[in-house]
């Protein structure tokens, strides 16, 4: 396939074949939801805990074997560049870029989340999710964790199991103060502001206040601000441009 594409595109367009992003994701929960349904999965936590945990363990081990096989066959790629990483970030680091055939798992960013377990206790989160997700996630050089779910009261479990954590998602539903205390300078504080403040109208003074409040609470953290899940911006990009200006003002 790559040779055929080269014959067609040579001299016209630079291209690179890469494995699907989903291969790098070690979450497993969404696959289980597709198999069982979310409601059934919630019941399984109580009705069949041992069986469910063994299935998650099998999924983690299977994904890890796939990753190692891709590494052996030199089919990985260096995602430490301008590539979507984690749950909205870019993969930039100061490490030198490598050709695909030279890339090892330890050169890459990996990712997992537990959105489907947003309302599950920290104990169940640790037992069923993170303890099995770590099998694949710890193979990577750098790990991202979390997406739209709040990780309140779950940070300690993440640190216990994920040895390479470098980026933690802080969603609009997260406790900012707890996140700032728990993340500190251990990882990137990957903040996702509330998109409804743009999607449902734009109050400049309210947005400035909102951003400054978060900036004060996170002043000792390594911050990145990712505006996600904007389904509409009111037929104008002016609000997005202004948001960027206000964010730079608040966090500078």
Name every feature range the model reports, one short phrase each.
Residues 1-252:
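Active-site loop segments of alpha/beta catalytic cores
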């Amino acid at each position: 396939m790559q040779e055929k594409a080269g014959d067609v595109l040579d001299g016209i367009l630079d291209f690179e074949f890469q494995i699907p992003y989903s291969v790098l994701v070690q979450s497993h929960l969404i696959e289980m939801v597709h198999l069982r349904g979310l409601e059934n999965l919630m019941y399984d936590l109580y009705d069949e805990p041992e069986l469910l945990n063994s299935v998650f363990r099998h999924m983690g081990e299977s994904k890890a074997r796939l990753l190692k096989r891709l590494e052996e066959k030199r089919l990985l790629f260096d995602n430490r560049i301008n590539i979507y990483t984690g749950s909205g970030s870019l993969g930039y680091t100061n490490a030198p870029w490598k050709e695909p055939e030279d890339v090892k798992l330890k050169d890459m960013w990996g990712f997992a989340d537990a959105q489907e377990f947003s309302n599950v206790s920290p104990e169940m989160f640790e037992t069923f999710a993170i303890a099995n997700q770590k099998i694949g996630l710890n193979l990577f050089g750098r790990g991202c964790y979390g997406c739209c779910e709040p990780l309140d009261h779950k940070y300690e479990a993440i640190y216990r199991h994920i040895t390479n954590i470098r980026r933690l998602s802080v969603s609009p539903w997260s406790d900012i103060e707890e996140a700032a205390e728990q993340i500190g300078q251990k990882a990137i504080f990957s903040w996702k502001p509330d998109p409804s403040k743009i999607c449902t109208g734009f109050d400049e003074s309210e947005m400035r206040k909102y951003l400054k409040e978060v900036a004060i609470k996170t002043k000792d953290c390594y911050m990145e601000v990712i505006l996600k899940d904007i389904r509409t911006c009111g037929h104008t990009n002016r609000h997005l441009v202004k948001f960027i200006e206000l964010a730079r003002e608040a966090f500078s």
